[in-house]
């Protein structure tokens, strides 16, 4: 309340500074005033914060079996990797939900684990190129409806050197979340080519390894969980710019790489070395299986530092795709490549048909090139380019048939014209 003789015009909101005449209502407290506009703003802030916690608590986390079944619809093969990823992702988001849930004593043992903090379990994905590592992670993020960012480890360097700082990875996640930091803090970051930042030798080097061990050291904190300062425009940090603060404690990191040569390290440890004429054949047949036997000590010999390996407790592998798997990838999943091109042709009112021989030939070419599933789209583009160039200019074509000859020998595809009905003569 104002003192006697004090002008009521001097009464102002203690928060926004507006006078009593500028607002609808001014509420007095012990020595302070607050206007109706500030009260409304405070209510909005409280509601937003409560909604964030409520959304996280009410988020219906799919069970591992449901995650696995969803991956089955889009990704061919790699069942062991799907199971490992489904369990790891489920446990990660269950851990986040438990952190936001109210304390309770109904834990089956009298609530004795209320003070236990569950550590984050990041994932290391090992396997040859073109086997679906990136696609697995993308599909997981789509199922969970969380922000997802992909980064390339080869572009990263230690702070102060030419290249990208590790914080730029976090900027990609923030951008994927439309700069909603709270949402980004529960996202997934996929770092590819992680094997390319292995140190040059097993023993620590005297010279500075800015793109190998230096990057591993720089990644340690954000992998474990820290509040990082991210330049909003990317690039290098400088002291006079503003930063976005993001807590990486609940960000799931999936790091992946081909790790070429790791099978030899595993083989030397397990004593599985071939001798004589059968050696190459023996190695080739067991190379895919050897990745599944990887141990932390093998990764240490490969060039990852112990602290980095320790922050990737979940290690899973993917294997090379065989001919049957490549054929299935072309036609079976919900968003199979063949279905995508059929939809594009359908927009022009044309049906696109592949016979079995064509699919077999495309799979064989991908195997010959050694590009795995990644090479399938490139082959399809090469095969369909002449048709996609001419077809929009033609209105007489009803369907296009792609055969084995078209794929292997560059033959012209079969063009089936529209059927025109003849008019009956009078």
Swiss-Prot record:
The keyword Flavoprotein does not apply. Component of the ClpX-ClpP complex. Forms a hexameric ring that, in the presence of ATP, binds to fourteen ClpP subunits assembled into a disk-like structure with a central cavity, resembling the structure of eukaryotic proteasomes. ATP-dependent specificity component of the Clp protease. It directs the protease to specific substrates. Can perform chaperone functions in the absence of ClpP. CDD domains: RecA-like_ClpX. One of its GO terms (cellular component) is HslUV protease complex. ATP binds at residues 128-135. Transmembrane segments: none annotated. Residues 1-54 form the ClpX-type ZB domain. Keywords: ATP-binding, Chaperone, Metal-binding, Nucleotide-binding, Zinc. Belongs to the ClpX chaperone family. This is ATP-dependent Clp protease ATP-binding subunit ClpX. One of its GO terms (biological process) is proteolysis involved in protein catabolic process. PANTHER family: ATP-DEPENDENT CLP PROTEASE ATP-BINDING SUBUNIT CLPX-LIKE, MITOCHONDRIAL, ATP-DEPENDENT CLP PROTEASE ATP-BINDING SUBUNIT CLPX-LIKE, MITOCHONDRIAL-RELATED. One of its GO terms (molecular function) is zinc ion binding. It comes from the Bacteria. HAMAP family: ClpX. Zn(2+) binds at residues 13, 16, 35, 38.
